[in-house]
Amino acid sequence: MPKLRSATSTQGRNMAGARALWRATGMKENDFGKPIIAVVNSFTQFVPGHVHLKDMGQLVAAEIEKAGGVAKEFNTIAVDDGIAMGHGGMLYSLPSRDLIADSVEYMVNAHCADAMVCISNCDKITPGMLMAAMRLNIPTIFVSGGPMEAGKTKLSDQLIRLDLVDAMIEAADPNVSDERIDAIERSACPTCGSCSGMFTANSMNCLTEALGLSLPGNGSMLATHADRKELFLKAGRQIVELCKRYYEQDDASVLPRSIGTFDAFENAMSLDIAMGGSSNTVLHLLAAAQEAGMDFKMEDIDRLSRKVPCLSKIAPNTNKYHMEDVHRAGGIMGLLGELDRAGLIHKNTHTVLGMSMGEQLDQYDIIRNQDEELHKFFRAGPAGIRTTQAFSQDCRWDTVDNDRVNGCIRNKENAISQEGGLAVLFGNLAEDGCIVKTAGVDESIWKFTGTAIVFESQEDAVAGILGGKVKEGHVVVIRYEGPKGGPGMQEMLYPTSYLKSMGLGKKCALLTDGRFSGGTSGLSIGHASPEAASGGAIGLVRDGDIINIDIPNRAINLEISNDELATRRAEQDQKGWQPANREREVSFALKVFGHFATSADKGAVRDKTLLK
């Protein structure tokens, strides 16, 4: 029978000092011997997705205490990618993921916690906590802060829905008036919560449902809705139940590595492909799999992308649907239900509710279960009132969206595309693969041959786009922006947004060893591996080279001979794989990250071989 980890610091005469300190935190005599459960919060006033989380930790803690556990809360950092975007702050975003994972490990192991409830929400916080959960392998439940309501404003006598990406694109268009930009800016982000489309934050929170590590509704229930409160309360109660099953009944099936198996990771990736989620999820799932000691690779993602169709298009891939619409259509359980009916997921994986995924779908899929209370849960909708308060409204749609022919979520027979929403491309430009979010690419340019125009940094690319250097037919190559080369693997939302604002969104392609915001759409290919700083062929491209992109055949190639490629490589080996004429201040902390970082195909995790 597993012994409580916390017994290390709470039992025995030699732990009298530790117990004295525990008592100083408020523990009573009868608390010793109970599981100590870490409530891992991420409240900050810097991030709208986290601004409402201040009281959530104590909400969960109270339920843990009622259920027979001892709750101890601590906080992690949280970076807002949208605020850090477009300047040096973005260099810190991806490294913060690993810092979060380490900080959770430090706190949990230093204090011998028995389990965790992870209160996450935005881009790098959920992945960082997921990496920690897989690393620590103690009972864990995720509960996120929830999505923001979609923005709404009246323009030209028409009510439109929008988000922060609309604000960025419109602001970059010189033909758009200041008045229109101001109206969009003030309406784009109306409430607390993670940005309202299927961007990275919401994609990752949805994926925790598919992994079985969060409760149904976690990825789609609005941050503002009163029903979301029950997810926090239930997480508090359920984590104590998981502790009992593991520590008292020796049931290891409740542990993260038993729930997040290879099959569960396939379920999560299949969901991501079906919903056209952020390409960043690939990076984070690969990283989490490595923490679990699992051999889940780019080739597995490629295999899944060839058989899983695109069943839903959500902002930024369309203006028609946002996360509130996904929830109305049955949320992630609805999407997984359609994948199940198509024979495309594993039903025998476990979930934190103590049932199989198949059993959970029987209970929570609105198509197979017509229970009135279930449908009421998924009718939870937006109020359209600006607020930073969680649980502040109780509005509901009149009906759920169960239209699987033309609705927000389709069945396989009526799929938006039989090609999935993400694809892995291989070729001499990316021998270890690169990622494109096909859900955001117009099918007319799935095959694209263009002329390379090369930039050594995101800043130079932005200047080139806005300065008119980039023309129709160009493949914009932005290199030395990978995990090692940046360092930090910046997101390229500004270059892609500016291409759209300049009328080049369907007339150009963009290739980078950096990554893209979940808000990106268009022919934007990221994660080119190996990256330039690690000797990748993207570092050998020259202005005027012809690049051939073939999404249907999953190929991307530089159209030069092998001999010419070898000659260029030999020349670059002599020069060193460094960006030319780039001025960038890099802090010591970022240099450390870059020194250890692997390329994107490995999840941009640290290279453990450097420590041997």
Swiss-Prot record:
Keywords associated with the record: 2Fe-2S, Amino-acid biosynthesis, Branched-chain amino acid biosynthesis, Iron, Iron-sulfur, Lyase, Magnesium, Metal-binding
Cofactor: how and how many bound: Binds 1 [2Fe-2S] cluster per subunit. This cluster acts as a Lewis acid cofactor.
EC class: lyase
GO biological process, one term: L-valine biosynthetic process
Any one GO cellular component localisation term in the record: cytosol
Molecular function (Gene Ontology), one example: magnesium ion binding
The reaction(s) this protein catalyses: (2R)-2,3-dihydroxy-3-methylbutanoate = 3-methyl-2-oxobutanoate + H2O; (2R,3R)-2,3-dihydroxy-3-methylpentanoate = (S)-3-methyl-2-oxopentanoate + H2O
Catalytic residue positions: 517 (proton acceptor)
Pathway noted in the entry: Amino-acid biosynthesis; L-isoleucine biosynthesis; L-isoleucine from 2-oxobutanoate: step 3/4; Amino-acid biosynthesis; L-valine biosynthesis; L-valine from pyruvate: step 3/4
Sites where the protein binds Mg(2+): 81, 123-124, 491
Cofactor dependence: [2Fe-2S] cluster; Mg(2+)
Taxonomy, superkingdom: Bacteria
Function: Functions in the biosynthesis of branched-chain amino acids. Catalyzes the dehydration of (2R,3R)-2,3-dihydroxy-3-methylpentanoate (2,3-dihydroxy-3-methylvalerate) into 2-oxo-3-methylpentanoate (2-oxo-3-methylvalerate) and of (2R)-2,3-dihydroxy-3-methylbutanoate (2,3-dihydroxyisovalerate) into 2-oxo-3-methylbutanoate (2-oxoisovalerate), the penultimate precursor to L-isoleucine and L-valine, respectively.
Protein name as annotated: Dihydroxy-acid dehydratase
Organism: Haemophilus influenzae (strain PittGG)
